[in-house]
């Protein structure tokens, strides 16, 4: 595991900053490794997607460091370095975490969900039945304009909902905890499925990691109890 100090040194070198330059605000995200055993995605696709994810992590760290010295006095809504960095910070932060959530909840070769499982019961409760949740989620996958489909736990209503996210930061619902994440940017599937997003998402749904999903559900509902 690389230490925060080592990563800050990497950031300094990439930005050509000397040792005296403070990068206190650098949040120092670290890349994670995912063993995607699925055969529904080719090796080239997996490698390209991995490199894209690593790029978001690197950019997030750079932006976070640049914010340390950004001018906060001459800021306006039309054009300013601070505004641009804050927008890019959210974009890259969402991108890296959405990718981590996605990689972690796909590629389970022993994927299985039972009617008495927590995930099955919760999704059936809030969507009428499990099949209705799945149909709605697949519709969200098709509706996204280069972005994501996400099943969230709404901490305010304490119910599960599906959402369409465009890019990484458009239409992101507030106060919601992601439990199922599907990447429907074309980079996620074009090398293997061309523009056939439906075949791609159907394949990914067959290998959802319900163990990971249920762990997220438990965490989400614990958070909701704390903030009630």
Predicted regions and their residues:
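Feature for soluble, non-membrane regions of globular proteins
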Residues: 3-6, 10, 14-228
């Amino acid at each position: 595991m690389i230490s925060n100090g080592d990563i800050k040194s990497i950031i300094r070198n990439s930005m050509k900053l000397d040792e005296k330059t403070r990068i206190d605000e650098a949040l120092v995200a670290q890349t994670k490794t995912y063993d995607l055993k699925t055969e529904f995605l080719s090796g080239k696709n997996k490698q390209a997607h991995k490199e894209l994810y690593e790029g978001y992590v690197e950019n997030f760290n750079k932006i976070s460091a640049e914010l340390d010295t950004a001018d906060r006095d001459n800021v306006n809504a039309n054009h300013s370095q601070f505004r641009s960095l804050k927008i890019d910070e959210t974009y890259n932060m969402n991108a890296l975490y959405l990718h981590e959530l996605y990689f972690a909840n796909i590629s389970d070769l022993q994927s299985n969900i039972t009617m008495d499982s927590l995930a099955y019961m919760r999704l059936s409760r809030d969507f009428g039945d499990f099949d209705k949740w799945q149909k709605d989620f697949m519709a969200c996958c098709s509706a996204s304009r280069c972005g994501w489909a996400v099943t969230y736990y709404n901490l305010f209503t304490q119910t599960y909902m599906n959402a369409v996210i465009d890019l990484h930061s458009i239409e992101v619902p507030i106060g919601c905890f992601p439990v199922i994440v599907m990447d429907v940017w074309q980079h996620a599937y074009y090398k293997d499925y061309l523009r056939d997003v439906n075949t791609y998402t159907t394949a990914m749904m067959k290998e959802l990691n319900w163990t990971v999903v249920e762990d997220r559900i438990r965490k989400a509902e614990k958070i909701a109890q704390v903030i009630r």
